[in-house]
């Protein structure tokens, strides 16, 4: 394994030590001053009075800083070449999204009826285009669409000289976007998909079938995702899909309209409600979503992750398949919303996929120059907090308490399996020892059908099916377990093994109850508690805790 050789005279241990992080922050500030003196002065002014910026000023500053954070991290970890290669992949895909918006949506399909599009000779047009763009027979759709977009972008530079090929391209785009055969051919692509209007009462596409005299609704068969065993069934969007969504976003923080983050408001300031009565409050963390989308669309994945980590440092436990309050409050209320969770998760995965990617993400949860209010962990306070429950609430609270300088002991009723001491820094007996940097995140990944139930994560461990990659729980666990101010104990029941009086007798200054709601959401339908009828939460808990999943 290649050893980690950090720049600026820092060691790996410095990244987990407050004094080392202070030196790191000074190195970044000097790096910024050398590269952009005016931006450096803006950062220093903002750190002195972060609330004086206002929302718009803070957004502009973070977006401007993000590329510099990315360059600094690439140099710090010695992966500048890999970071530039990741940026290049983003830039190579850029024509897809500009051509989709400016040519396909605004020209090719405008005013064209579906019947007229279906009458076009799509296969014949495709053969002509294959010759013009140099596509080979059987070429994969993402690559074909990229070739098409690159050529159309070049042809648009001189529309007069390229009128004939642009007309051909426009007719093909209309066929591919509007006709049933075209939509089927490009079902796995992004270029010829336009946002659809939303019918809130028919959000899931279904078809009507009749079987044995009974009329029923079902998902169209070509949308079925077959599950065999307990392997991961949803790997999420790839880079093409995530950037498609990031470019679909109109980056409305520029107008102060980023309702995905701040919620949709009525004129009186109250939050709007959906047709189902759901409050459209946006992201509970007020994550800077629009800013993330803009920076990601510009090709800066590390910079985008740094923006996410300001408000949502434990983003490994959010995103795709976990939460969608942001989507519900998206400014697009009458058409498909931006798939924000996909963008967030893809951004994290792109960083984790770099050499030392886990260490970069981990570092941003402790030191984040874009966090104007707490760029560094605060000095130790000597205060001790007992966190009851290691589900999403417990582990997120524990993280923030540690960064505020407190000591945290966390307990959970589930048995928590130990991790190897060389990656966790904790031996089986609970003693601390040095741990190794992780170069390749694959070292932390297990197949979900082979994965041992680790016990960490609460409801995220036992209540979520294999549509979500539970390897993220190991990543979250390591963010905490490697911290010297944190200890956790499984198989401890609050109120039994330890009581509130016992906790204070042990010297804890505060007890935080993060044990969950305790009761399931009961669906209000007749006979819902009849024998043989199980609530989803009850079924999943029994499935996971009895080992039936294995």
Regions found by a protein language model. Name each.
Residues 477-497:
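A conserved beta-strand/loop element that lines the FAD pocket in flavoprotein oxidoreductases
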Residues 380-409:
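N-terminal Rossmann-like FAD-binding beta1-loop-alpha1 element of flavoenzymes
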Residues 498, 502-510:
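Core beta-strand elements of the Rossmann-like FAD/NAD(P) dinucleotide-binding domain
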Residues 407-408, 487, 509:
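Residue-level detector of anion-binding/catalytic polar loops
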Residues 2-380, 428-482, 513-532, 537-540:
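Ferredoxin-type iron-sulfur electron-transfer modules and their immediate structural context
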Residues 398-400, 422, 523-527:
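Short amphipathic alpha-helical segments
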Residues 548-550:
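Predominantly flavin-linked oxidoreductase catalytic cores and closely associated redox partners
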């Amino acid at each position: 394994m290649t050893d980690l050789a950090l720049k600026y005279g820092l060691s790996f241990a410095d990244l987990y030590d407050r004094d080392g992080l202070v030196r790191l922050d000074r190195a970044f500030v000097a790096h910024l001053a050398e590269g952009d003196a005016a931006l450096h002065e803006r950062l220093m002014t903002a750190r002195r009075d972060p609330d004086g910026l206002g929302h718009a000023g803070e957004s502009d500053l973070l977006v401007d800083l993000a590329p510099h954070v990315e360059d600094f991290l690439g140099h710090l970890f010695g992966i500048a070449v890999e970071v530039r290669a990741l940026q290049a992949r983003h830039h190579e895909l850029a024509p897809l999204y500009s051509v989709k918006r400016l040519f396909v949506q605004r020209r090719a399909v405008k005013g064209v009826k579906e019947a007229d599009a279906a009458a076009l000779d799509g296969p014949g047009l495709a053969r002509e285009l294959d010759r013009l763009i140099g596509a080979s027979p059987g070429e994969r759709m993402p690559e074909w669409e990229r070739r098409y977009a690159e050529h159309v972008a070049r042809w648009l530079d001189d529309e007069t000289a390229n009128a004939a090929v642009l007309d051909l391209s426009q007719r093909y785009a209309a066929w591919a976007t509007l006709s049933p055969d075209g939509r089927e051919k490009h079902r796995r692509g992004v270029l010829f998909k336009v946002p659809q209007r939303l019918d809130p009462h028919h959000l899931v596409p279904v078809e009507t079938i009749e079987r044995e005299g009974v009329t029923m609704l079902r998902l169209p068969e070509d949308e079925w995702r077959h599950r065999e065993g307990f392997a991961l069934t949803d790997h999420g969007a790839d880079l093409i899909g995530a950037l498609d969504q990031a470019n679909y976003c109109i980056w409305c923080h520029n107008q102060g309209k980023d309702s995905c983050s701040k919620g949709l408001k009525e004129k009186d300031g109250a939050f709007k409600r959906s047709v189902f009565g759901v409050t459209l409050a946006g992201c509970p963390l007020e994550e800077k979503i629009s800013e993330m989308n803009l920076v990601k669309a510009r090709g800066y994945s590390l910079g985008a992750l740094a923006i996410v980590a300001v408000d949502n440092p434990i983003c490994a436990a959010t995103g795709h398949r976990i939460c969608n309050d942001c989507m519900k409050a998206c400014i697009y209320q009458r058409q498909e919303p931006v798939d924000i969770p996909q963008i967030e998760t893809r951004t994290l995965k792109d960083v984790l996929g770099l050499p030392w990617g886990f260490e970069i993400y981990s570092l941003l949860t402790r030191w984040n120059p874009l966090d104007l209010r707490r760029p560094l962990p605060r000095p130790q306070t000597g205060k001790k907090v007992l966190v009851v429950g290691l589900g999403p609430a417990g582990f997120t609270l524990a993280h923030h308490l540690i960064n505020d300088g407190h000591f945290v002991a966390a307990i959970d009723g589930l048995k928590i399996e130990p991790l190897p001491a060389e990656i966790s820094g904790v031996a089986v007996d609970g003693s601390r020892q040095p741990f190794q940097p992780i170069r390749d995140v694959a070292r932390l990944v297990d197949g979900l059908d082979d994965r041992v139930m680790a016990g960490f994560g609460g409801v995220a461990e036992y209540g979520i099916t294999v549509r979500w990659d539970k390897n993220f729980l190991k990543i979250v666990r390591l963010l905490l377990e490697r911290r010297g101010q944190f200890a956790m104990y499984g198989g401890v029941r609050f109120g039994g093994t330890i009581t509130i009086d016992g906790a204070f007798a042990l010297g804890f200054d505060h007890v935080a109850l993060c044990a969950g709601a305790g009761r399931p959401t009961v669906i209000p339908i007749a006979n819902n508690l009849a024998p043989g009828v199980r609530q989803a939460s009850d079924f999943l808990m029994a499935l996971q805790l009895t080992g039936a999943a294995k």
